[in-house]
Amino acid sequence: MEDLAKFLFGVSGNVIALFLFLSPVPTFWRIIRRKSTEDFSGVPYNMTLINCLLSAWYGLPFVSPNNILVSTINGAGAVIETAYVVVFLVFASTHKTRLRTLGLAAAVASVFAAVALVSLLALHGQHRKLLCGVAATVCSICMYASPLSIMRLVIKTKSVEYMPFLMSLAVFLCGTSWFIYGLLGRDPFVTIPNGCGSFLGAVQLVLYAIYRNNKGAGGGSGGKQAGDDDVEMAEGRNNKVADGGAADDDSTAGGKAGTEV
Protein backbone atom coordinates (compact mmCIF):
# COMPACT_ATOMS: atom_id res chain seq x y z
CA MET A 1 0.00 0.00 0.00
CA GLU A 2 2.84 2.38 0.82
CA ASP A 3 4.48 1.71 -2.55
CA LEU A 4 1.18 2.37 -4.32
CA ALA A 5 0.71 5.65 -2.46
CA LYS A 6 4.27 6.69 -3.34
CA PHE A 7 3.64 5.87 -6.99
CA LEU A 8 0.39 7.85 -7.07
CA PHE A 9 1.97 10.92 -5.48
CA GLY A 10 4.87 10.61 -7.92
CA VAL A 11 2.50 10.50 -10.89
CA SER A 12 0.60 13.47 -9.49
CA GLY A 13 3.87 15.37 -9.11
CA ASN A 14 4.79 14.52 -12.71
CA VAL A 15 1.52 15.87 -14.09
CA ILE A 16 1.60 19.13 -12.11
CA ALA A 17 5.29 19.69 -12.77
CA LEU A 18 4.73 19.21 -16.51
CA PHE A 19 2.09 21.96 -16.38
CA LEU A 20 4.62 24.22 -14.67
CA PHE A 21 7.34 23.41 -17.20
CA LEU A 22 5.00 24.29 -20.07
CA SER A 23 3.63 27.47 -18.48
CA PRO A 24 6.19 29.75 -20.25
CA VAL A 25 5.04 28.59 -23.72
CA PRO A 26 3.00 31.81 -24.30
CA THR A 27 6.11 33.83 -23.46
CA PHE A 28 8.24 31.95 -25.97
CA TRP A 29 5.54 32.08 -28.61
CA ARG A 30 5.67 35.85 -28.19
CA ILE A 31 9.47 35.84 -28.49
CA ILE A 32 9.32 33.76 -31.68
CA ARG A 33 6.53 35.89 -33.14
CA ARG A 34 8.41 39.12 -32.46
CA LYS A 35 11.82 37.60 -33.21
CA SER A 36 13.25 39.20 -30.08
CA THR A 37 13.69 38.31 -26.42
CA GLU A 38 13.01 41.98 -25.58
CA ASP A 39 13.63 42.53 -21.85
CA PHE A 40 13.17 38.92 -20.79
CA SER A 41 15.98 37.19 -18.93
CA GLY A 42 17.36 33.80 -19.94
CA VAL A 43 18.95 33.14 -16.57
CA PRO A 44 15.95 31.38 -14.95
CA TYR A 45 15.76 28.86 -17.80
CA ASN A 46 19.44 27.99 -17.53
CA MET A 47 19.09 27.64 -13.76
CA THR A 48 16.06 25.41 -14.15
CA LEU A 49 17.93 23.37 -16.76
CA ILE A 50 20.83 22.55 -14.43
CA ASN A 51 18.39 21.64 -11.70
CA CYS A 52 16.46 19.33 -14.03
CA LEU A 53 19.64 17.67 -15.26
CA LEU A 54 20.95 17.02 -11.75
CA SER A 55 17.57 15.82 -10.47
CA ALA A 56 17.07 13.54 -13.47
CA TRP A 57 20.55 12.10 -12.92
CA TYR A 58 19.85 11.57 -9.23
CA GLY A 59 16.68 9.61 -10.02
CA LEU A 60 18.41 7.08 -12.26
CA PRO A 61 18.49 3.51 -10.86
CA PHE A 62 22.29 3.29 -10.60
CA VAL A 63 22.34 6.46 -8.49
CA SER A 64 19.11 6.31 -6.49
CA PRO A 65 17.04 3.11 -6.81
CA ASN A 66 13.23 3.32 -6.94
CA ASN A 67 13.16 6.99 -7.95
CA ILE A 68 12.51 6.64 -11.68
CA LEU A 69 9.54 9.04 -11.49
CA VAL A 70 11.99 11.74 -10.43
CA SER A 71 13.99 11.06 -13.58
CA THR A 72 11.01 11.00 -15.95
CA ILE A 73 9.68 14.46 -15.12
CA ASN A 74 13.07 16.09 -14.78
CA GLY A 75 14.24 14.47 -18.00
CA ALA A 76 11.21 15.94 -19.73
CA GLY A 77 11.90 19.24 -18.00
CA ALA A 78 15.50 19.23 -19.22
CA VAL A 79 14.33 18.79 -22.82
CA ILE A 80 11.78 21.60 -22.47
CA GLU A 81 14.23 23.97 -20.80
CA THR A 82 16.86 23.22 -23.45
CA ALA A 83 14.33 24.26 -26.09
CA TYR A 84 13.71 27.51 -24.19
CA VAL A 85 17.45 28.24 -24.01
CA VAL A 86 17.85 27.57 -27.74
CA VAL A 87 15.03 30.02 -28.49
CA PHE A 88 16.81 32.59 -26.33
CA LEU A 89 20.03 32.07 -28.25
CA VAL A 90 18.34 32.35 -31.64
CA PHE A 91 16.22 35.41 -30.86
CA ALA A 92 18.46 37.24 -28.38
CA SER A 93 17.71 40.96 -28.61
CA THR A 94 21.37 41.95 -28.28
CA HIS A 95 24.75 40.35 -28.87
CA LYS A 96 25.49 40.76 -25.15
CA THR A 97 22.33 38.84 -24.25
CA ARG A 98 23.29 36.03 -26.61
CA LEU A 99 26.80 35.78 -25.19
CA ARG A 100 25.49 35.80 -21.64
CA THR A 101 22.97 33.06 -22.36
CA LEU A 102 25.59 31.01 -24.20
CA GLY A 103 28.03 31.41 -21.31
CA LEU A 104 25.44 30.26 -18.80
CA ALA A 105 24.52 27.29 -20.97
CA ALA A 106 28.19 26.31 -21.15
CA ALA A 107 28.48 26.60 -17.36
CA VAL A 108 25.37 24.43 -16.93
CA ALA A 109 26.82 21.76 -19.21
CA SER A 110 30.17 21.88 -17.39
CA VAL A 111 28.67 21.55 -13.91
CA PHE A 112 26.43 18.67 -14.94
CA ALA A 113 29.26 16.89 -16.75
CA ALA A 114 31.51 17.25 -13.71
CA VAL A 115 28.93 15.82 -11.30
CA ALA A 116 28.01 13.00 -13.67
CA LEU A 117 31.61 11.99 -14.41
CA VAL A 118 32.77 12.14 -10.79
CA SER A 119 29.77 10.12 -9.63
CA LEU A 120 30.32 7.52 -12.35
CA LEU A 121 34.08 7.16 -12.27
CA ALA A 122 35.10 7.95 -8.70
CA LEU A 123 32.15 7.06 -6.48
CA HIS A 124 29.95 4.06 -5.83
CA GLY A 125 26.90 3.13 -3.78
CA GLN A 126 25.92 5.55 -1.04
CA HIS A 127 28.77 7.93 -1.82
CA ARG A 128 27.50 8.33 -5.38
CA LYS A 129 23.96 8.90 -4.12
CA LEU A 130 25.20 11.42 -1.54
CA LEU A 131 27.10 13.55 -4.07
CA CYS A 132 24.29 13.59 -6.63
CA GLY A 133 21.63 14.10 -3.96
CA VAL A 134 23.41 17.05 -2.35
CA ALA A 135 24.02 18.69 -5.74
CA ALA A 136 20.38 18.28 -6.77
CA THR A 137 19.10 19.42 -3.37
CA VAL A 138 21.18 22.61 -3.32
CA CYS A 139 19.92 23.56 -6.79
CA SER A 140 16.34 22.69 -5.86
CA ILE A 141 16.38 24.84 -2.73
CA CYS A 142 17.83 27.75 -4.69
CA MET A 143 15.08 27.39 -7.27
CA TYR A 144 12.38 27.12 -4.63
CA ALA A 145 13.70 30.24 -2.90
CA SER A 146 13.53 32.29 -6.10
CA PRO A 147 9.84 33.30 -5.67
CA LEU A 148 10.86 35.33 -2.62
CA SER A 149 11.47 38.35 -4.86
CA ILE A 150 7.97 38.03 -6.32
CA MET A 151 6.47 37.65 -2.85
CA ARG A 152 8.34 40.76 -1.75
CA LEU A 153 6.91 42.59 -4.76
CA VAL A 154 3.39 41.48 -3.81
CA ILE A 155 3.83 42.79 -0.27
CA LYS A 156 5.40 46.03 -1.53
CA THR A 157 2.67 46.80 -4.08
CA LYS A 158 -0.14 45.10 -2.12
CA SER A 159 -1.17 43.52 -5.41
CA VAL A 160 -1.15 39.92 -6.68
CA GLU A 161 -0.95 41.10 -10.28
CA TYR A 162 2.43 39.41 -10.77
CA MET A 163 1.56 36.24 -8.85
CA PRO A 164 -1.23 34.31 -10.64
CA PHE A 165 -3.36 32.14 -8.37
CA LEU A 166 -3.17 29.02 -10.54
CA MET A 167 0.62 29.18 -10.63
CA SER A 168 0.83 29.56 -6.86
CA LEU A 169 -1.62 26.70 -6.36
CA ALA A 170 0.33 24.49 -8.76
CA VAL A 171 3.58 25.25 -6.92
CA PHE A 172 1.98 24.27 -3.62
CA LEU A 173 0.43 21.06 -4.99
CA CYS A 174 3.60 20.05 -6.82
CA GLY A 175 5.83 20.65 -3.81
CA THR A 176 3.40 18.81 -1.53
CA SER A 177 3.13 15.82 -3.88
CA TRP A 178 6.89 15.39 -4.09
CA PHE A 179 7.31 16.07 -0.37
CA ILE A 180 4.96 13.18 0.46
CA TYR A 181 6.64 11.05 -2.22
CA GLY A 182 9.97 11.68 -0.51
CA LEU A 183 8.56 10.88 2.92
CA LEU A 184 7.10 7.60 1.73
CA GLY A 185 10.40 6.71 0.08
CA ARG A 186 12.40 7.90 3.10
CA ASP A 187 14.54 10.02 0.81
CA PRO A 188 15.78 13.27 2.38
CA PHE A 189 17.08 14.53 -0.97
CA VAL A 190 13.51 14.62 -2.25
CA THR A 191 11.79 15.49 1.02
CA ILE A 192 13.86 18.51 2.11
CA PRO A 193 13.72 20.70 -1.03
CA ASN A 194 10.10 19.89 -1.73
CA GLY A 195 9.14 20.54 1.87
CA CYS A 196 10.58 24.02 1.32
CA GLY A 197 8.64 24.27 -1.94
CA SER A 198 5.38 23.24 -0.33
CA PHE A 199 5.86 25.79 2.46
CA LEU A 200 6.68 28.64 0.06
CA GLY A 201 3.72 27.66 -2.11
CA ALA A 202 1.48 27.86 0.96
CA VAL A 203 2.88 31.31 1.77
CA GLN A 204 2.08 32.44 -1.77
CA LEU A 205 -1.51 31.25 -1.34
CA VAL A 206 -1.79 33.13 1.96
CA LEU A 207 -0.49 36.30 0.29
CA TYR A 208 -2.98 35.80 -2.52
CA ALA A 209 -5.81 35.49 -0.01
CA ILE A 210 -4.71 38.70 1.70
CA TYR A 211 -4.20 40.82 -1.44
CA ARG A 212 -6.56 39.13 -3.93
CA ASN A 213 -8.86 42.16 -4.09
CA ASN A 214 -6.00 44.49 -5.01
CA LYS A 215 -5.22 43.24 -8.53
CA GLY A 216 -3.83 46.05 -10.62
CA ALA A 217 -3.47 48.29 -7.57
CA GLY A 218 0.25 48.62 -8.20
CA GLY A 219 -0.24 51.59 -10.49
CA GLY A 220 2.59 51.69 -12.99
CA SER A 221 1.69 48.39 -14.61
CA GLY A 222 -0.97 49.92 -16.81
CA GLY A 223 -3.76 47.83 -15.36
CA LYS A 224 -2.34 44.61 -16.77
CA GLN A 225 -4.40 41.60 -15.70
CA ALA A 226 -3.34 38.05 -14.99
CA GLY A 227 -2.46 36.26 -18.19
CA ASP A 228 0.55 35.71 -20.40
CA ASP A 229 2.44 38.66 -18.93
CA ASP A 230 1.92 37.29 -15.42
CA VAL A 231 3.45 34.03 -16.52
CA GLU A 232 6.27 35.99 -18.08
CA MET A 233 6.98 37.66 -14.77
CA ALA A 234 6.93 34.26 -13.16
CA GLU A 235 9.58 33.15 -15.60
CA GLY A 236 12.09 35.83 -14.84
CA ARG A 237 11.14 38.89 -16.88
CA ASN A 238 12.65 42.19 -15.70
CA ASN A 239 9.25 43.73 -15.15
CA LYS A 240 8.69 47.27 -13.98
CA VAL A 241 7.05 47.71 -10.63
CA ALA A 242 4.75 50.41 -9.38
CA ASP A 243 7.40 52.82 -8.20
CA GLY A 244 9.06 52.88 -11.61
CA GLY A 245 11.95 50.64 -10.65
CA ALA A 246 12.78 47.20 -11.96
CA ALA A 247 12.00 43.98 -10.22
CA ASP A 248 14.97 41.83 -9.33
CA ASP A 249 16.78 40.76 -12.48
CA ASP A 250 16.64 37.05 -13.16
CA SER A 251 14.05 36.41 -10.47
CA THR A 252 11.76 33.45 -10.92
CA ALA A 253 8.40 32.78 -9.43
CA GLY A 254 7.06 29.54 -8.14
CA GLY A 255 6.25 28.29 -11.61
CA LYS A 256 9.76 27.13 -12.14
CA ALA A 257 10.74 26.52 -8.59
CA GLY A 258 7.84 24.19 -8.14
CA THR A 259 9.12 21.72 -10.65
CA GLU A 260 12.31 20.72 -8.93
CA VAL A 261 12.47 17.34 -7.22
Curated annotation (Swiss-Prot):
Subcellular location field: Cell membrane
Membrane topology: Multi-pass membrane protein
Record keywords: Cell membrane, Membrane, Repeat, Sugar transport, Transmembrane, Transmembrane helix, Transport
Sequence ranges on the Extracellular membrane side: 1-6, 64-71, 123-129, 186-189
Subunit structure: Forms homodimers.
Similarity annotation: Belongs to the SWEET sugar transporter family.
Name recorded for this polypeptide: Bidirectional sugar transporter SWEET1b
